[in-house]
Structure formats: structure tokens, C-alpha cells
């Protein structure tokens, strides 16, 4: 019997169609470029630096975070199930000279091949795009070394996140294309922590990601009502 992959074909197709514009700083992925320094600094600070670390970026897309970690001196592998985003990621790395690998594979498949391999695993803005986020979390836990770090980021599911992420970001401000997100797939922090608790990971820190449309500015803060990041360590 063929094992069913933890992949939503509609989600893959959506990002395949936008792949050529992944590194357009004023295009659909502008918000990812804007928040990337925040994500990079958060991972760097909480993991005790990146230089020389072996890192897996799950759901890497066109490689924005993966490439920035490689530039910091990490040994990075980017993992995704979108062929076009990975092609764009590889081409951009050639242009910049960044040294990293990209692999077309699910997190679950990678975990079977490379258990307890990575010092750091990042899984950013990905869990809300797969049918079974708990399976991805378990795979990330399997792939990280003992005492290694795993980072997850996603969107909370409540009225405010619908207003900000769907109505605001997609419909009014057009920060991202309509249909980028499905509010029903957003994950409450309590739900994410419950899934983490089913693995050897222990949650250590949580922070929110905030946006001011008047100043077009992002920052990290205490409130986790919309976007948030969780730092975990493998026991």
C-alpha cells in the first residue's frame, strides 16, 4: 500500500504559481522578506548562534530563511515539496554564492532518513499549510539531536487573526494574495503546545510577531494573538 504523504496539493500548487516572484522584495513575498531578520535573530539568539551548526529548514519555500542562515555560517538543508520554489531557491543561492542544499521531500520522509541529525530545525509559516501538523512536529522532533533546538511559527486561530491575516493582509492591504491562508487551518498556541507535548520536545519560549500597517513595520512582542513563534528544546 502506498503511504499517503502529508501534503495538500492545492497548497503546493498555490506556491508553485508564485515561485518566480519569491525573491521580489516588493512582490507577494515582501512580508516574508520584512520579517526574516526578526526570525533569523530569534533563532540565532535562542539557539546560541548559528555558525557551524547543522540546520534543517522545513517548508523552506524559495529559501529566504534557509539562505540567510547559511550566510551566517551554518550548514543548512532546505526541505520543501514544491519543485518550483526549490528551483528558485537553488538559482538564488547560485547568484549570491550561498552554500546550502535543497531537497524535495516531506518532513516525515526526511525524519526516516536522518533521525537525530540536526542541531537546529526550523519550521516557519508551514504548519498551517499541511493536513496533519502534528505529524510534521513529530518529524521535527525526531530529526533534531538531543538538546537541539526546534522552532515553529504559525498563526493563531481567533477573530483578531481573521481580521488581521485574512481581511487586513489579504483583502484590504493586499500584503499577500487572496487565498494564501485558510483561517480554519490556523493553530492556537494551546493546540501547538499540546502537539509539542506528544514529542520529546519541551517548549521554552513563545513570542508574538506584530505589524503596524501605518509604518509598515514588524516587531516581536508578548502578544500571541495573531502570528507567533515557539522555541523548543529536545530532552
Swiss-Prot record:
Its EC number is 2.1.1.222, 2.1.1.64. Gene3D superfamilies: Vaccinia Virus protein VP39. CDD domains: AdoMet_MTases. InterPro entries: SAM-dependent_MTases_sf (IPR029063), UbiG_MeTrfase (IPR010233). The keyword Metal-binding does not apply. One of its GO terms (molecular function) is 3-demethylubiquinol 3-O-methyltransferase activity. Keywords: Methyltransferase, S-adenosyl-L-methionine, Transferase, Ubiquinone biosynthesis. One of its GO terms (biological process) is methylation. Signal peptide: none annotated. Pathway: Cofactor biosynthesis; ubiquinone biosynthesis. It catalyses: a 3-demethylubiquinol + S-adenosyl-L-methionine = a ubiquinol + S-adenosyl-L-homocysteine + H(+); a 3-(all-trans-polyprenyl)benzene-1,2-diol + S-adenosyl-L-methionine = a 2-methoxy-6-(all-trans-polyprenyl)phenol + S-adenosyl-L-homocysteine + H(+). Pfam families: Methyltransf_23. Transmembrane segments: none annotated. S-adenosyl-L-methionine binds at residues 39, 59, 80, 124. NCBIfam families: UbiG. Belongs to the methyltransferase superfamily. UbiG/COQ3 family. HAMAP family: UbiG (MF_00472). O-methyltransferase that catalyzes the 2 O-methylation steps in the ubiquinone biosynthetic pathway. This is Ubiquinone biosynthesis O-methyltransferase.
Amino acid at each position: 500500500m502506498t503511504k499517503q504523504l502529508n501534503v495538500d496539493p492545492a497548497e503546493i500548487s498555490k506556491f508553485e504559481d508564485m515561485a518566480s516572484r519569491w525573491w521580489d522584495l516588493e512582490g507577494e513575498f515582501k512580508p516574508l522578506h520584512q520579517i526574516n531578520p526578526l526570525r533569523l535573530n530569534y533563532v540565532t539568539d535562542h539557539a546560541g548562534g548559528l555558525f557551524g551548526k547543522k540546520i534543517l529548514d522545513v517548508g523552506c519555500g524559495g529559501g529566504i530563511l534557509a539562505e540567510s542562515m547559511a550566510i551566517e555560517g551554518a550548514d543548512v538543508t532546505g526541505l520543501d515539496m514544491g519543485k518550483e520554489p526549490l528551483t528558485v531557491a537553488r538559482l538564488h543561492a547560485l547568484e549570491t554564492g550561498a552554500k546550502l542544499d535543497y531537497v524535495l521531500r516531506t518532513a516525515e520522509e526526511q525524519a526516516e532518513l536522518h533521525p537525530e541529525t540536526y542541531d537546529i530545525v526550523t519550521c516557519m509559516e508551514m504548519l498551517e499549510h499541511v493536513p496533519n501538523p502534528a505529524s510534521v512536529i513529530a518529524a521535527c522532533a525526531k530529526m533534531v539531536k538531543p538538546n537541539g533546538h526546534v522552532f515553529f511559527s504559525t498563526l493563531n486561530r481567533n477573530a483578531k487573526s481573521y481580521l488581521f491575516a485574512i481581511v487586513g493582509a489579504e483583502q484590504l492591504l493586499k500584503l499577500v494574495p487572496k487565498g494564501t491562508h485558510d483561517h480554519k487551518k490556523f493553530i492556537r498556541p494551546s493546540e501547538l503546545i499540546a502537539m509539542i507535548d506528544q514529542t520529546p520536545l519541551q517548549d521554552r519560549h513563545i513570542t508574538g510577531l506584530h505589524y503596524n500597517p501605518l509604518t509598515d513595520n514588524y516587531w516581536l512582542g508578548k502578544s500571541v494573538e495573531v502570528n507567533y513563534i515557539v522555541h523548543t528544546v529536545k530532552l
